[in-house]
Swiss-Prot record:
Pfam families: T2SSB. It is a single-pass membrane protein. The chain crosses the membrane at residues 37-57. GO terms for cellular component: plasma membrane; type II protein secretion system complex. It is found in: Cell inner membrane. It comes from Aeromonas hydrophila. Its main location: membrane. Signal peptide: none annotated. Keywords: Cell inner membrane, Cell membrane, Membrane, Transmembrane, Transmembrane helix, Transport. Belongs to the ExeB/OutB/PulB family. InterPro entries: GspB_C (IPR032389). This is General secretion pathway protein B. Involved in a general secretion pathway (GSP) for the export of proteins.
Length: 226
């Protein structure tokens, strides 16, 4: 009985058949328009995805190469030029007077005549050599004995002597070779150094000047400032 009731209920219910699209049937216009819109939307999306993939690939594979380079700085020392300084020196002291060498006569008994003539010639030579020295020494010794230091002159006579810059002093046993350099000029014995000032003698360590008839001495290589 129950079995019959179930069969009747099934017969009364509507039967459902699934819709299976037939192959080869024409597609409607509405479905074709929907497909076109889908393709238009997918095309830009595909382009954007391709561009993003390309940018990501280049970003990963084209990273900048970083390399540390050490730069060595060369320091050039400054060039300093040193000029040599001129050396200012005083002239050398005058040479000592040349000694007079007298030959010694040895007696020879075998030739008395020759010894006599040699001794006579020697005496004549000695007399000739000593005569100029004696003539020059006498006035010089007299002037030296009467000379006073130039600093001891009275003020009136000091003003007559100009400033003297002593450059050089040359003394020799030969009076013709004696000379001094004063204020850049060379003077010899008897020369006028300035108006009223005469150089009358050049000794080994000083000179004798005559100022208004008064003899004064000035040390060699010592400047006179006036």
């Amino acid at each position: 009985m129950s079995t019959l009731l179930k069969a009747l209920r099934r017969a009364e219910q509507p039967q459902f058949t699934p819709h299976i699209p037939a192959m080869g049937l024409p597609v409607t216009q509405e479905e074709e328009q929907n497909r076109r819109w889908i393709w238009w939307l997918l095309a830009p999306l595909a382009l954007l995805m391709g561009a993003g993939a390309n940018y990501g690939w280049h970003l990963l594979n084209n990273r900048p190469i970083e390399k540390t380079v050490e730069v060595k700085e060369v320091v050039t020392p400054p060039f300093v030029r040193v000029e040599p300084r001129p050396m200012i020196t005083r002239p050398l002291p005058p040479p000592l007077p040349e000694p007079v060498v007298r030959p010694r006569v040895t007696p020879n008994d075998s030739a008395p005549a020759a010894n006599g003539s040699q001794g006579l010639a020697e005496r004549i030579m000695n007399a000739l050599n000593s005569t100029p020295l004696m003539e020059e020494t006498a006035p010089q010794a007299q002037s030296e004995s009467q000379a006073m230091p130039i600093s001891a002159l009275p003020l009136e006579l000091k003003q007559r002597v100009p400033p003297l810059a002593y450059g050089s002093h040359v003394f020799s046993s030969n009076p013709a070779k004696r000379a001094v350099m004063l204020n850049g000029r060379e003077f010899r014995e008897g020369s006028e150094v300035a108006p009223g000032v005469t150089l009358i003698a050049i000794a080994q360590d000083y000179i004798i000047l005559q100022v208004a008839g008064q003899n004064v001495s000035l040390k060699a290589l010592q400047d006179w400032r006036g």
